[in-house]
Amino acid sequence: MSDAVPTESIQLQVLDSVLYGAAKAFDYLGIRGQDMLDKVGEGILDYCIKRGFIKRADDPQQFAHEIITFFKNNGYVRDVEVTQDGEILTITMRGWNFIPLMSKLRNQNCFLLSCPLWMANNSFMNANSLGWKRINERVTADGAYVEQVKFVPPAAATRLPPEPDDMSTVKAESNVGKRIGLPAFEATEYGLARAFDYLGAQAQLLLDSVGSGAVEFLQSELHVQLPKNRRESLQELSSVYTQGGLADKIDLNLSDSKLEVAFANYRYAPVLERLLDEGYRLTSCPFTLAARAVLRNAGFAATEMQWRVLNDRNAEMRMELRVAGQEFDEDKIGRIMDGV
């Protein structure tokens, strides 16, 4: 239930790397890319309900409260306050750990919200035929995010206020070293894998683009230095994600034809197991996405990935390699989005 405080956590930078990658991957669609990210929210809510992390409620206000409480208890936001004056709602978020990432994206002219809380909320709003017209936003001197909105029909909803806040002036505290509850990590990772299934053959290629963004994030935020040698680069990624708490140990066996990885006490294992049980072929493991990007930069691409989930959150992955070629087709994804 949403009032349960998790006993296990993972470093936020592990999740931030793929949230940054996801926003960057859809940036070329402009604000329509938010529709893609909101599909991640569908998976987040589905996972939370199936796992009993939140309780489904017929009352929209109660369900929204469940979502907020879940992310508060998982350490993603300290407090969310909503006040109303006539038609106008003022939402104040304190200790919101998306602000550093939002500032980084805004400074690159990317206005997509890959925040798990917002993606889940947007999905909930869409499912209930609700929309928000965003009026204004600001970040206060003490780091709180304040936004004013009003409810409108979905067709009149807006993704941004008329004048988005200038995040270049925000001195946001870095998320490096901060932690998030494991349930929130699992739910978001599940949503990322689930969201793109309808894209068919383009889906894995798009997730590979997310992996490229994850590598960019690690290099810029954690100052990770990746050697030109692909084996050494993969070892460095293994070290970074192990230190972040993705697994206690990540062992690699690399050749020109395959990559084999063994994960010990793998925090992604519950997500992986559920995806495989439900018949999904896509996975969103941060290490695997980043590793695929490193291999692609070295001229290799994966033709097939095989997973085995063992006991005690241990797992094994085998990735067949070939000479890289195809990239994801932006125009094709745009056409698919026209039908969403």
Model-flagged regions — what are they?
Residues 1-115, 120-127, 131-286, 297, ...:
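N-terminal accessory segment detector
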